[in-house]
Design a protein with these regions (language model features):
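Glycoside hydrolase catalytic-domain context in secreted enzymes
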Residues: 1-183
Length: 183
């Protein structure tokens, strides 16, 4: 059962809600202007630099409440990428769109942000991660050419997949459940 989206009986009866999604990340994506009336939120790297999961939770609550008011029930983003210092911002790496370069803290910050989105929307918003494991260290952006991730599998599993593992855990604390759709 998706949290707050519909009941099990509705799904069995063939009813699924229309998903209205957005990739709009408030100010988490520096390439998107914040529409009038919505609260500007620090960029992902700035928020991640605080290492403050309570702040990420609060920012998620703001995003969840405002997007829910607009009728959005599918949140695409923020990026689950881990910034890699070996790939510059111009190459295709995550750059400022990532919460940081430490896989553990990236996962914890994103997880807190998602819990905040769920709380702020009263469980009415599902989440889809805005990336694919390893793109934070790719040699080119996916819009330019097929990205190549020059890492051994072991390193990819240790670093880039860690935020996905953290976010897809079954619960946060004892009362929250996180719904995540993987690309």
């Amino acid at each position: 059962e998706a949290v707050g989206m519909s009941s099990q009986s509705d799904i069995r009866a063939g009813y699924l809600p229309l998903l209205i999604g957005t990739k709009y990340n408030h100010n988490l994506d520096e390439n998107i202007n914040v529409p009038a009336g919505l609260t500007p939120i620090p960029g992902a790297m700035a928020l991640g630099a605080t290492w403050n999961t309570n702040l990420a939770l609060s920012m998620g609550e703001i995003a969840g409440a405002e997007l829910s008011e607009l009728g959005v029930n599918l949140y695409v983003g923020p990026s689950l990428d881990v910034a890699d210092s070996r790939s510059g911002a111009g190459s295709g790496g995550a750059g400022l769109g990532a919460f940081g370069g430490n896989p553990y803290w990236v996962g914890e910050m994103i997880r807190s942000f998602i819990v905040g989105v769920h709380r702020g929307s009263s469980g009415r918003i599902a989440f889809v991660g805005d990336s694919f494991p390893g793109l934070g260290s790719a040699d080119s952006g996916s819009g330019i050419d097929a990205p190549v991730i020059n890492k051994p599998l072991e390193e990819l599993v240790e670093s880039d997949l860690n935020p996905y593992r953290i976010v897809t855990k079954s619960s946060y604390g004892s009362e929250e459940r996180i719904d995540v759709l993987m690309p």
